[in-house]
Amino acid sequence: MAKDVEGPEGFQTRDYEDPPPTPFFDADELTKWSLYRAVIAEFVATLLFLYITVLTVIGYKIQSDTKAGGVDCGGVGILGIAWAFGGMIFILVYCTAGISGGHINPAVTFGLFLARKVSLIRAVLYMVAQCLGAICGVGFVKAFQSSYYDRYGGGANSLADGYNTGTGLAAEIIGTFVLVYTVFSATDPKRNARDSHVPVLAPLPIGFAVFMVHLATIPITGTGINPARSFGAAVIYNKSKPWDDHWIFWVGPFIGAAIAAFYHQFVLRASGSKSLGSFRSAANV
């Protein structure tokens, strides 16, 4: 909640109060159309995200495959793939933030749930919608690129040769921490009260965080940092290697999201202790 107050120089500034923590379990949400509208928005956004990004990955591999008429350094390269992921997140967060919050990622939803920004019901429904949207998005890629999809790996995440499990897990934890920490910072109530007149300020750093993490971790894991993205690609591609490594792309992002939530709420924000107390109180009701 924000309100105009008189600054020291006579200018109008915006004061704010932290919104109250979301109830842990809010059954009343199930009766509201706004919840289902948000769930649909998450489904469609994740579908579009996976469709564009996995199509970009496969297109790059086609263009750079010298055995199939491609050329060395052909296609968009790793830089272009990173831009595709970061750019789509920027676009989709901008489009859906006012409807669902623009999570498009179970790890983001999990972090916001731990910080009492969303209820358990909303978090679970979002995660289900995100995973289903991811499956459908990759399914469209396979349907439209059936001759290339399996040949070029289906955009599925797996641990690259030469890297051990610990390295891959660490890459996913740290990468997701960067993303979720950016989400918390970009959507901070104090920042929103001050910069609410610039609506792109939240989607832009979130998309840029996704871009930077992809540049760093594509060579290691193909960059997950989004369990729905990894799950959707693994389901449609359905080969042993992505499934063998699949746990990394759930455990790593969830650990990274939890650390980011704790760091932002209980280290950087004084209101964190209040959220923790209200979480315990709600759990005991």
Curated annotation (Swiss-Prot):
Residue positions, PTM N6,N6-dimethyllysine? 3
Effect of changing residue 197 to A: reported as: Reduced water transport activity. Reduced sensitivity to cytosolic acidification. Insensitive to cytosolic acidification
Q: Which molecular function GO terms apply here?
A: mRNA binding; water channel activity
**Keywords in UniProt for this one?**
Acetylation, Cell membrane, Membrane, Methylation, Phosphoprotein, Repeat, Transmembrane, Transmembrane helix, Transport
Q: What is the annotated localization of this protein?
A: Cell membrane
Instruction: Tell me the residues on which Phosphoserine occurs.
Output: 278, 281
Enumerate composition-biased segments (Basic and acidic residues): 1-17
TM region positions? 38-58, 75-95, 124-144, 166-186, 200-220, 248-268
Q: How does it sit in the membrane?
A: Multi-pass membrane protein
What GO cellular-component annotations does this UniProt entry give? endoplasmic reticulum; plasma membrane; plasmodesma
Phenotype upon changing residue 197 to D: Reduced water transport activity. Insensitive to cytosolic acidification
Protein's UniProt keywords contain Membrane: yes
Question: What segment(s) does the record annotate as region Disordered?
Answer: 1-22
Report the principal subcellular site.
membrane
- Name of the protein this chain belongs to: Aquaporin PIP2-2
Q: Organism, per UniProt? A: Arabidopsis thaliana
What gene is this protein translated from? Answer: PIP2-2
